[in-house]
Amino acid sequence: MWASHGSTLSDELARVGHAVTADAPVAEAANNDLVLIDAPAPHIPAVITALEPHVRHGQMVLHTLLGEGVQILDPLEVRGAVVMAAHHIFDDFWVTAAADELGKATVNLLISEIGGTPVPVADEQRPTLMAAQRLRALEYEVRLDAYNLLRGVIPGIEVKAEDFIHGSERPYAYPEDAATLETIRSAFADPAARELYEGLEGRRRTRTGRPYPGTHEF
């Protein structure tokens, strides 16, 4: 398996016995049955373009972006690749997608092989998933405020700061560009939940000093 970057999925596949080649020249992808595209979101189009001349008919290609379905892999599919998507959500749950039945069977097998539970999702469900994951990530702001209150009262709590603030699992760091954040905001159908989300985004920007990248200011 050729992987564009090291990731949770490539590590898990290596754990169950797959030979993984990470961060190798793109030309080497042609020698692998499975190509895993797990680059940060802004770099995915460039990786796909670089891979296009090297992809062969029947080769499996999988990306790990939450915000994109398999359509982003169209340039590789037209060259005969079996295209799939899988993203880790929480615990053993992975959301998946594929362009055809072979892809569905393959991605289900890969995720099941690492002990995961594959959950097929449609593209229109992805903004809701992104909103849920972003809200989980923003929980950090609440935990940090709570920790700062406790630190003034409980001596020695600093040694437990990491566990208190982050918990057992850190949600994926999703892109924070204006379009992505507006997609996430629009996914909150419940006005109260949207207001909570906006408040947490505002709290994060106050703490980090980062201006909001779009026209809608939280």
Which residues does each PLM region occupy?
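Structural motif
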Residues: 1-5, 38-41, 64-66, 97-101, ...
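Interdomain hinge/lid region at the active-site interface
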Residues: 152-218
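Hydrophobic anchor at the start of a short beta-strand
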Residues: 19-21, 83, 118
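Hydrophobic beta-strand residues in large extracellular and virion-surface proteins
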Residues: 20, 35-37, 107
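Conserved beta-strand termini and adjacent loop/short-helix elements that scaffold enzyme active sites
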Residues: 23-25, 86, 121-123
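Internal alpha-helical scaffold of NAD(P)-dependent oxidoreductase catalytic cores
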Residues: 8-12, 16, 76-79, 91-172
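NAD(P)+-binding Rossmann beta1-loop-alpha1 motif at the extreme N-terminus of oxidoreductases
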Residues: 1-30, 150
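Rossmann-like NAD(P)(H) cofactor-binding subdomain of soluble oxidoreductases
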Residues: 26-91
